């Protein structure tokens, strides 16, 4: 039995889960918020009871020390020697990393070198890695990359039709994200279908505040909707998804915004929030549609129809599909979104049951038993994938 901690470090936050392996039992989980800001918040669950503390947490090293201190204080572990491995989520692995890696100083340096590909995320992930290394220098640590699963995409999927030297010199290509989630749910779908993943064509819809669709053939990602950054693809909570690139100088000219300001608008003020004008939270949008809010209705239709189109194009790409998977916050919980996305897909053999679709947050088949294409809701579990990779690489 080993104890593995899975870490997801953001710029001012640190999410954690402690697993007992190989049983994959969650011993505790929690969140440190507002790191480096006033009134930091530390939350941990102890015997299914949430304990919260507010205190100043100046940096990630302090957050890590606090977390480890609480694990022993609450008797979750006897001492720090019980921690056998640490798994870190790293958003961008570039072309360099097509699998998770054991973290050496050299590997940390290589991750730092590709940080320009994900300036919002990778630096924070690295801060988390270094904070743990400082406090637990002898515990093996593994980096698990969001982009790694998509490194199996063929050239025709990942190349942009730009001058080829941009790819050679600057690494400009599609990378794709949510890879750990897409990998988990497609492997789980194969188990639920009782078929080897090698013979399956799956479309995975990871729908949260960020959303991406992946075409997974024989267990390998062959295409995905996000691109060089997580801004591409379908419309999201606050992100625009795909737009005509010529709009950027046009918007700059019309509004007087700089390129960075337009990019900020595309990342933080667009998507569901941009169209509805009042919220990026899908639950608010759905409630507003019930009250007859037309802009909310439009936002919901745009969101669902873009996903619907990706499903059609990926089915064509794989010459068919065996199952469609819904996961992440919206995919797992929004009956309405699934209904709108699936509507009209009968022509390709998707027959779903409105009664079975009335499910939230748990594994379920929502297609009729006779449906040639199965539709499955699978709650994602990126943390357990991280823990499994630590066991695979460090033990």
UniProtKB/Swiss-Prot annotation:
ATP binds at residues 15, 206-210, 281-283, 329-333. The active site is at residue 146. Pathway: Metabolic intermediate biosynthesis; acetyl-CoA biosynthesis; acetyl-CoA from acetate: step 1/2. PROSITE patterns: ACETATE_KINASE_1, ACETATE_KINASE_2. Its EC number is 2.7.2.1. The keyword Kinase applies. Keywords: ATP-binding, Cytoplasm, Kinase, Magnesium, Metal-binding, Nucleotide-binding, Transferase. This is Acetate kinase. It comes from Bacillus licheniformis (strain ATCC 14580 / DSM 13 / JCM 2505 / CCUG 7422 / NBRC 12200 / NCIMB 9375 / NCTC 10341 / NRRL NRS-1264 / Gibson 46).
């Amino acid at each position: 039995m080993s104890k593995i901690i899975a870490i997801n470090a953001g710029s001012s936050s640190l999410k954690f889960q402690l697993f007992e392996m190989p049983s994959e039992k969650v011993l505790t989980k929690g969140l440190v918020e507002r790191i480096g800001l006033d009134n930091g918040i530390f939350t941990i669950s102890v015997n299914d009871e949430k304990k919260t503390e507010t205190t100043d947490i100046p940096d990630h090293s302090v957050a890590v020390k606090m977390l480890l201190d609480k694990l022993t204080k609450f008797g979750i572990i006897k001492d720090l020697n019980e921690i056998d491995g640490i798994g870190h989520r790293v958003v961008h692995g570039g072309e360099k990393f097509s699998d998770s890696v054991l973290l050496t100083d050299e590997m940390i340096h290589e991750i730092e070198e590709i940080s320009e590909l994900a300036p919002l995320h990778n630096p924070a992930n690295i801060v988390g890695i270094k904070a743990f290394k400082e406090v637990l220098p002898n515990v093996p640590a593994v980096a698990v990359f969001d982009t790694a699963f998509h490194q199996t995409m063929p050239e025709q999927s990942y190349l942009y039709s730009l001058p080829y030297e941009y790819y050679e010199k600057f690494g400009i290509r599609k990378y794709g994200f949510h890879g750990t989630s897409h990998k988990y749910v497609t492997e789980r779908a194969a188990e639920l279908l009782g078929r080897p993943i090698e013979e399956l064509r799956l479309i995975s819809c990871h729908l949260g505040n960020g959303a991406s669709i992946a075409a997974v053939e024989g267990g390998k990602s062959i295409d995905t909707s996000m691109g060089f950054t997580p801004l591409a693809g379908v419309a999201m909570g606050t992100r625009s998804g795909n737009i005509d690139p010529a709009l950027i100088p046009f918007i700059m000219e019309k509004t007087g915004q700089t390129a960075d300001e337009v990019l900020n608008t595309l990342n933080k003020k667009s998507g569901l929030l941009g169209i509805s004008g009042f919220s990026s939270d899908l639950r608010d949008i759905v409630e507003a549609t019930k009250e007859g809010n037309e802009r909310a209705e439009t936002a919901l239709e745009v969101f669902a129809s873009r996903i619907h189109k990706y499903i059609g194009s990926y089915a064509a790409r794989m010459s068919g599909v065996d199952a469609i998977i819904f996961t992440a916050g919206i995919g797992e919980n929004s009956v309405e979104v699934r209904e709108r996305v699936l509507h009209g897909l009968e022509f390709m053999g998707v027959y779903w049951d409105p009664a079975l679709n009335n499910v939230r947050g748990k594994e379920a088949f929502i297609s009729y038993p006779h449906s040639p294409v199965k539709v499955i809701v699978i709650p994602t579990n990126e943390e357990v994938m991280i823990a499994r990779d630590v066991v695979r690489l460090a033990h």
